[in-house]
Amino acid sequence: FAEFRLPGFDYPLRVLLTPYTNGQRAKRYMGTEDADEGLRVFLRDHWAGLADKYCDTEGGNLLVAHLFMAREGGELPEEPEDERPINIGGADVVYTSLIPPAMQYAALGHLHRWQTVDTEPCPAVYSGSPLSYSFSEAEQDKYVTLVDLEPGCPARVTKRRLTSGHPLARRRFEGVEVALQWLAEHPDTWVELTVATDTFLTAQEVKSLHAAHDGIVCIIPDVRDASLVNDRVASIHD
């Protein structure tokens, strides 16, 4: 728990802080094999105790947590491919119903896509990452969240789309020439490029693609003739 007095405000900001929890350490700490349920009970009681002691209606009350949180009985948020799964070998789902009623907003971390997982007892929001971390997040808009808190009032939540940084794109083209045209039109993009080809891409074709664009992360040839691929694999094994 932390309380802040900020210039220009005549009321304090109270923050309940919950970092990432390792499942094995949680088991040892709580002395239980059911770390998931044990963690949920522990967080419920711990949060409630702090909220009852410090979080009245005379200040702004905020929960900040690195947890896999969802509405009980609702659809689970999707974890990004490149993020360590927090609910496998770590802490499992923590339900939004455990958030103390005194909280006005829950700022959540771990998931990379902006999403609101619940609005009760307060908005529980993953603001997501400011930039895409992998091509599993290609074409995904990124946001920051602005939250206005006043004592005893619902939080006013505004999301702002980020426009800085290079976007990630996954693109497939029927041939090198079409790919070169698209690359010329999108210079400020990181690209995972798939090129359909009757045979394998030549060294000159690969060189021309890289020369046309500085943001190519990888080039994937999609060979139409499966027998060529099979022959290449057979020659490698031989």
Predicted feature descriptions by range:
Residues 149-238:
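Accessory, non-catalytic peripheral segments of nucleic-acid enzymes
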Residues 56-57, 97-102, 119, 183-186, ...:
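Short, conserved loop/helix-junction motifs that constitute active-site signature segments
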Residues 69-153:
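Conserved beta-sheet core of the metallophosphoesterase superfamily
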Residues 21, 112, 199:
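Flexible, active-site-proximal loop/turn residues at the rims of small-molecule/cofactor binding pockets
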Residues 2-13, 18, 122-190:
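Binuclear metal-dependent phosphoesterase catalytic core
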